[in-house]
Structure formats: C-alpha cells, structure tokens
Swiss-Prot record:
Keyword DNA repair belongs to the record: no
Protein name (Swiss-Prot/TrEMBL): Large ribosomal subunit protein bL34
Protein's organism: Granulibacter bethesdensis (strain ATCC BAA-1260 / CGDNIH1)
Entry's Gene Ontology molecular function annotations: structural constituent of ribosome
Cellular component annotations (GO), alphabetically ordered: ribonucleoprotein complex; ribosome
Amino acid sequence: MKRTYQPSKLVRKRRHGFRARMATVGGRKVIANRRSKGRKRLSA
C-alpha cells in the first residue's frame, strides 16, 4: 500500500493556495476567518 501523502508543490498551490481560496465564496470565508484569528500564514 502506498502512502497517502505524496508531496507536490504544484498540487499544493493549486488546491490550497491563496488564488484557489479567493476563487470561491467558501475559500474567501476561510481567508477571512484566518485573518480575524491572526494567522501568520493565510494559505499554503
């Protein structure tokens, strides 16, 4: 059985990056929540 986490910078950026978050309403909410909480990193 192969491991579930196969790191890829490209896939990481495309799925969880800032631009990907801003593309949807739900993603924008995620960014807003993380901003209000004061997270240092908003997205991947």
